[in-house]
From Swiss-Prot:
Name assigned to this protein: Large ribosomal subunit protein uL3
Pfam families for this protein: Ribosomal_L3 (PF00297)
InterPro entries cross-referenced by the UniProt entry: Ribosomal_uL3 (IPR000597), Ribosomal_uL3_bac/org-type (IPR019927), Ribosomal_uL3_CS (IPR019926), Transl_B-barrel_sf (IPR009000)
GO terms of molecular function: rRNA binding; structural constituent of ribosome
Family: Belongs to the universal ribosomal protein uL3 family.
UniProt feature coiled coil, ranges: none
Positions carrying N5-methylglutamine: 150
Stored NCBIfam families: L3_bact
SUPFAM superfamilies in the record: Translation proteins (SSF50447)
Function: One of the primary rRNA binding proteins, it binds directly near the 3'-end of the 23S rRNA, where it nucleates assembly of the 50S subunit.
One example of a Gene Ontology biological process annotation: translation
Amino acid sequence: MIGLVGKKVGMTRIFTEDGVSIPVTVIEVEANRVTQVKDLANDGYRAIQVTTGAKKANRVTKPEAGHFAKAGVEAGRGLWEFRLADGEEFTVGQNISVELFADVKKVDVTGTSKGKGFAGTVKRWNFRTQDATHGNSLSHRVPGSIGQNQTPGKVFKGKKMAGQLGNERVTVQSLDVVRVDAERNLLLVKGAVPGATGSDLIVKPAVKA
């Protein structure tokens, strides 16, 4: 089953009939418009390309304008691709709404996490800080040793050190679908999802459901 592209609106909470508070993320899923259908004969795999939202006319490049015009759809804010399963069929220009998730219990949500800039090991990797006193005057938040000796004489790949934190593609799996509001194009999922308010999200049925 394909997924949909939405926009993170923010977090709130809803209450069950028993008065239990559920933290939810609100995702606005406007109609996803099919801009291209890829098939085995021409592309070697089956997939659809979709767009959503709108883009100012002066921000649409000529290649983009031609691509959207050929599909007969309004220029969107980006292009995304979803692989098709056997038996799934879509046509160029078709609109896919949030009702796609009407019978889905759990979803995987992919987004770009908030960028935190250059961060030390305590913030980035949850390293313990060293002693505040007892003779320690300069090394409270330093990572400590990063290697051994002349053998192996190098720092191993993957060593946890200071560096860029966040601003990377992150997927949160198996979030419960709390509500599908087709009238307002909203999808409510339990818990937090990656990214800042207003950022694009890819929502797919959970692979581990």
